Amino acid sequence: MADPSFFVGIVGNVISILVFASPIATFRRIVRSKSTEEFRWLPYVTTLLSTSLWTFYGLHKPGGLLIVTVNGSGAALEAIYVTLYLAYAPRETKAKMVKVVLAVNVGALAAVVAVALVALHGGVRLFVVGVLCAALTIGMYAAPMAAMRTVVKTRSVEYMPFSLSFFLFLNGGVWSVYSLLVKDYFIGIPNAIGFALGTAQLALYMAYRRTKKPAGKGGDDDEDDEEAQGVARLMGHQVEMAQQRRDQQLRKGLSLSLPKPAAPLHGGLDRIIKSFSTTPIELHSILHQHHGGHHHHHRFDTVPDDDDEAVAAGGTTPATTAGPGDRH
């Protein structure tokens, strides 16, 4: 009968490779758009270093075949991601990224391998490399804590995808069980931390997944609409009162010189103000109908403007004073 650790390791391989393959959709988008957009490149560089060191660790650990297969596959995928990012990154980003890749994935990795092979032997070599691998893995598992802080602050799981949290939980749990079966604490400690963080993320997801996002994006627009409506009501009321005063003056036989409508206080109120504006000719027509039974009429002592001259010449009456947007 096969060792249970082998079956657990196979399951861990499948889950881990799925996690490593998750950025494929991101890089398909990068290739199609020929741009790295706002995607970060540092996680792929650090993951490439981590998987490379774990592969080296598995090669020197007795019975470490499953460690080699999963991390070797991960290192190959991460190398492809780094290469694609370099191909489509902007010139400044590319120059900076090349320096980091050469320093971390070439220089640091080569230094660790050289020291381990030349200066360290047996159990000491395995211990030193195992500590480095565990430290890198803990750092990678701690990275999603920023997303957890964002969830708590915004009370929204928008920035913490469920699938990523679930696979973090599952991957950490499976490899923690594997570490107990093979008694490898360099694998167990970082994956136990990953399992705990994955559990915490799932708990946050369950707590905030039904929470509605606070209305914040449309707040400024709503305030502008309310302000515009208030100004519209105020302007309409003022124009109506002004017309009432004109009617009273006309009834008393006073001469009236109508001012031109004032420029609108708000761009969106142009049509509203136009609807309340009347020309002297229209007002005279209305008053003539109102006082049709009387034997007197009122004389306008106003100086005709361009519109009045046009009416007198052409026999038509403009409905409103044209604003800047209505002239052709």
Swiss-Prot record:
Instruction: Quote the biased-composition stretches of kind Basic residues, using this chain's numbering.
Output: 288-299
Q: From the record, give the transmembrane residue ranges.
A: 6-26, 39-56, 64-84, 100-120, 126-146, 162-182, 186-206
One Gene Ontology term of the molecular function aspect: sugar transmembrane transporter activity
Q: What's in the keyword line of the UniProt record?
A: Cell membrane, Membrane, Repeat, Sugar transport, Transmembrane, Transmembrane helix, Transport
Q: How does it sit in the membrane?
A: Multi-pass membrane protein
Q: Which GO terms describe its biological process?
A: carbohydrate transport
> Which superkingdom, per the lineage?
Eukaryota
Q: Where is the MtN3/slv domain?
A: 6-92, 127-213
Biased composition of type Low complexity is found at 312-328
Q: Where in the cell is it found?
A: Cell membrane
Q: Where is this region: Disordered?
A: 288-328
Q: Do you know which InterPro entries this protein is assigned to? A: SWEET, SWEET_rpt
List the stretches on the Cytoplasmic face of the membrane.
27-38, 85-99, 147-161, 207-328
Please give the Pfam families that the UniProt record associates with this protein. Answer: MtN3_slv
The keyword Transmembrane belongs to this UniProt entry's keyword annotation: yes
Q: A single GO CC term, please? A: plasma membrane
Residue intervals on the Extracellular side: 1-5, 57-63, 121-125, 183-185
- Family assignment from sequence similarity: Belongs to the SWEET sugar transporter family.
Record's function text? Mediates both low-affinity uptake and efflux of sugar across the plasma membrane.
Quaternary structure note: Forms homooligomers and/or heterooligomers.
User: What name has this protein been given in UniProt?
Assistant: Bidirectional sugar transporter SWEET16
Gene encoding this polypeptide? Answer: SWEET16
